[in-house]
Each structure stands twice: as C-alpha cells, then as structure tokens.
Amino acid sequence: MYSRKQGSAGDSMFRATIDRLIANRHLPFALMHRASTGNRLELLTGELSTIEALDQLPDPDHDGDGDGGARHDLLLLMPFRQIRERGFECVDDRAPMWLMRVTEQHEADRDTAVAWLPDHPVVLSDAAFDKDDAAYATIVRTILSEEIGRGEGSNFVLKRCFLARLDHHDTAAALSIFRRLLERENHAYWTFAISTGEGIFIGATPESHAMLADGELCMNPISGTYRYPADGPCANGLVRFLGDRKEADELYMVVDEELKMMASLCEDGGHIVGPVLKEMACLAHTGYVLRGACDQPVRDILRETMFSPALTGSPLESACRVIRRHEPDGRRHYGGVVALIGRDADARPALDSAILIRTADIDPQGQLRIAVGATLVRHSDPQSEAAETTAKLSCLLQAIRGDAVTDQPDTPVHATVLGALPGVQAALRQRNQSLADFWLRAADSRRRQYGGQLSGRVLILDAGDNFTHMLRCQLAAMGADVAIAPCDGAFAMDRFDLVLVGPGPGDPQDADHPRLRALRRITRQLLAERRPFLSVCLGHQVLSDILGLPLRRLAVPQQGVQREIDLFGQTCRVGFYNTFVAIADTDRIEPQGMELSVEISRDALTGEVHGLRSERFCSLQFHPESVLSRDGLDVLRYVTSQLMYSPHQVPRTATARS
C-alpha cells in the first residue's frame, strides 16, 4: 500500500520516520532535496531489492493507490558496470543495482526539517587518496600520449578515490553529514542520503542525468571547472575562466556526446539552451540544457544514456575501453545514476535522475570511498588535473568532518550572484557565437528554416560513433528519408540514393580490426559499383588510403578542435575529431587503375587533406554534424545534394525505393 502525507500531518510523519530510521540502522530509506522541488525535502521508504538489468525494471504502479496525484514508484541506484548493457567494456566489480519500490513518501519544508536532523561530529581515520598527486599525474600523461595521442578518442575521465574510515557510521552520523551538506551546498541538483540497509550513499551532485516530464527529455551536460580562489571568486577570474579555450573545449565535446544520446532517443534530436553557470559552494561549472520531444520508455532512456560523457569521455564506447585499461579496480557507483521513476499528475511517465558524483559511498564496516575525476583533453596539464580532483572533493569532505565554514558572507559564492558579476553574461553568450545554429534551434524552427532542402533516401553506415544519429537528424530536418545500419551488418545499398560512410574511432591503417575491414570492403564496393557516397572522418581516411594517399598520425591530435579552413574554395568554420590525417602535395590525383579524377582540398602549408571529391563521391575529414561545425549544415546540404541530384544519378523507381 502506497502512503503519502503532506501538511502538518506530513510533518509529523516525516519527523517520526526520521526517528524510526535513527533507531534502526538497517531500514532502507532515501532522504533528498532536488532542485525541481523548491524548498522541500522528500523522505522515501519502501521495499529494497537488487536487479541485474534494466529489463527487470518493473513498470510504474498504476493500481490506483494513493491520492491520484504525481508520485514516485521506484528509486534506482545504477552502478557503472551496467554499461555492459550497451555492449561496452568495463571492469565487473559486482557493484549491485539497488531498486526501491516506494511505499511511503513524505515531504517537509527544508528549513524546518533540517532542524530535526542530528548534527553529530564525524571522525575520519586513515584518510588518503588511493593514488597521490604524482601517481595520478603519471597516469594522466600515459592517457594523453597512449590513448588520445593514438586516436582512441577526444577526451577521457580518469578517477582516483579518497579513502577513509568513519569511527562511527550509524544512521545518525549519515544524517549529520546530509544536514551539513544541505547547509553548505545550496546549489546542488540533488542532495541525498540513501541507505540500502547495509551501506549508505551521501552526496551533493551538481549534474542532472536525464529528466522526462510532459513528454520532453532533458539532459544537462556540464564540464569545465572554475576553482574559487582562497579569497573567493571574482569577476576577472570568472571571465578569464569563461574565455579559456581548454575549458570551453571540454564542454563542447560533452555537448556533442550528449547530443548523440538525444539524437538516438528523440526523433528530432535535442536542441541546446544556454550556456548556464552552475554555482557550487567551492567551485562553479559551465553547462547547457538539451531538450527534445521523446516517447521512449524510461528503461530505454536510462539504457541509451549510460553514462554521462562528462564522467567517461568521447567517443563513449572507446572511453569505456580506456577506463577499463587504466582503472583496474572498477568504478562501483561512481559515474552511475540515481533515478526516481513514477508518474505525473496526469499519469504520464516521469523520470528525474542525477549523476552519482561528489558522493560518499560508506560500506557496512564504515569504510568511506569518494571517487573524483578530471576530464583529460589534448592540452591537459597533469598537475592541474590532480588539483581539480582535490577541489571537487573539498566541499563534501568539509561536510563530513564538520569543518568550520570560512567566514565570507559577502562573497558571490554565498550571495549566489556569480552570473551577475560584470562581464559574465557577455562571456557566456560569446561561447555560442561560433557554434552550429542548427543545434541552437528547436525542432519546429529547424523545420521552418531547413525543411524541403533535400529529398531522397540516405543510408548511414555506423562505424562505432553515434555521431551518425546527429547526421540523421540534420539530413532528416532537410527532408531526406534516412536509415542507419552497422557497417559490419547486412544492408541493401541499391535501395538508397546516397550512402554515407560514417565516422568512428580507431587507427585507419589497422588492417586486422573487423570494423576497419568492413569499411574498406564497403568503400571498395561503392567505388566499383559507382554509387554516390559521402565519407566522414574515419570513412574519409579509409577512402584516402584506398586512393593511394599516405596517412599520418598528427603530432598533436585534433580532438574537439574548431578550425577555419578553405574547402574547395569556400571558407568554412568546422569541428575536427581526428588523430590521423591524409597528406597530399597536389590538388588533384588520378588513382592508378580506377579511371577517376579526384579533387583534393588541403592545407597549403601542411598538406593535410580536408576533403576529397569526384563525380560520384565526396569525403570530409571534419564532422559537419558537430556542434563545433558552425558551417557544417551548409556543407552537408551542398555535398549531399550534389551527389544525389547531379546528372550522373539514375532516377529510382517508386518500387526500387520502397
């Protein structure tokens, strides 16, 4: 039976339940403050179990119990190892996926309820990082040289763990930590204490994972960290941070990754709102909000959004391999998700979820573990990344220890006015000036602006990077009928007017990798059958190699780099994600035995090839679909229309295209 109490009766039940939980440490519960609930605390109790996969997630309860209003049915704690459900690699540390069927839900005013919580001192012993700064910096250097430097991806998140032992670790101690977090960290997305009856999770996470409300899916990519100086944040320091290209690049790459997720779940993909400044007690982050209409089941949303690129890297599948190689002890729940699943007042599915970061994981023996990480990009400084992990730990650690709050009552961090400091809003707006307008427009605006510019059927071959879903959104918005198929799967190319050989991670010269073998076979077939095709990034590199152009590893990878280039006589600002590049010393080649004349767009100084084109194909080293490609949609429209509608194209009959 489901029970929910509000008002004075709810306050009494809330307080009585707190007392009951303190008296019995083995009762499972969830005590939360969520940004979407205003000044309310929520207290949930229920039946706790574990499940192995999201397919075992029960459907929301619609049995009519309760008051008929909005309600929570399920609380889910997803460990990082669930990424296996997407077929990605991970260390299987056997961390459980906890599921609570909510039977009681109580609410109380936050300011009132805080006074009902204990405020006991907590003593830590044997406190230290599992990897000191020097050891962490060494691994950072290894990832920069051996992973990013070899083309495995554009950015990766490396964690380390702060370990300690709590001398007292009962429910009263846990609620004391929660109380101090509430008092110190006013701007978290979720602040929570969740007991499994065995261990407990206590955290203040700044980052939403995914929210479904009124048929709209929202995600909140956050990246880039401004660490407050000892004397507090200031306008000049914050504006310098907002103008730092390294910090902006981190965020843009995360936005691209989450746009991929939105594009796989929403028919029209997501659109970008922001940027926004996420203020926390000890630091601030930059982020965006992504929105899109979505009719997918909650379990599918949770599966397809495993897990935030801000906590893994890009491309996601490649990032998981890198994490497995460099974090042999596993991640447990770090980077996983805590989710509330239920229904709204109109009985529609509802989801609110947060990323499990800035979270203490305390086991039944009182062993505390706090995982923190930093995003590594091509120009990361190892010592600075180590310092960033320490900064991310500081507020939670202060709340655990009960350290005195620094007396800075007039600083912006306490007044919550960082966004109002001189120059900050202009610096935030400036971040959008070089981004692709397509992703800044909502779906209806895109249809009005771009609809009807293309027709015909396009087959996108997925080579292991979900940028393909963003390409689908752009082509579909312009009017094309688009299908996606794995490059190593079965498909009928003769049913389509154009084949797009998609991007993917890896070394284009790796003759043994199954995906690369498939790309070579397909590209040779397209050339032999003289079918119109467009190749992007890895597909472009494979084509270049087949045509006889040498490939070279870049000394400095172009991962998440925006450049202004000359593309066949047109100036374009576009985004690159590549470690390898084709090289040419001429503007045209005629490959031996192919009866082709191929025009080359290249950097006049370095010989790096930006694109190739011939009568029936075109290729692009950059990603026209990336949020970094300000002119990407114009390029995509031009090359696809040229390939589909040029005189060589034989019209398809209605039967052949069905």
Where are the language model's segments positioned?
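Conserved hydrophobic core element of enzyme catalytic domains
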Residues: 292-419
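Contiguous alpha-helical scaffold segments within structured protein domains
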Residues: 103-127, 165, 226, 234-324, ...
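An anion-binding catalytic pocket shared by soluble metabolic enzymes
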Residues: 26, 34, 160-249, 342-369
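A short, well-structured beta->alpha microelement
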Residues: 14-15, 49-66, 476-493
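Acyltransferase
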Residues: 416-453, 625-658
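Flexible gly/pro-rich beta->alpha loop and the following alpha-helix that scaffold active-site loops
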Residues: 457-459, 465-535, 541, 547
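Pocket-forming structural segment of enzyme catalytic cores
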Residues: 520-536, 540-634, 638
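Non-catalytic accessory segments adjacent to catalytic cores
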Residues: 36, 46-168, 172, 214, ...
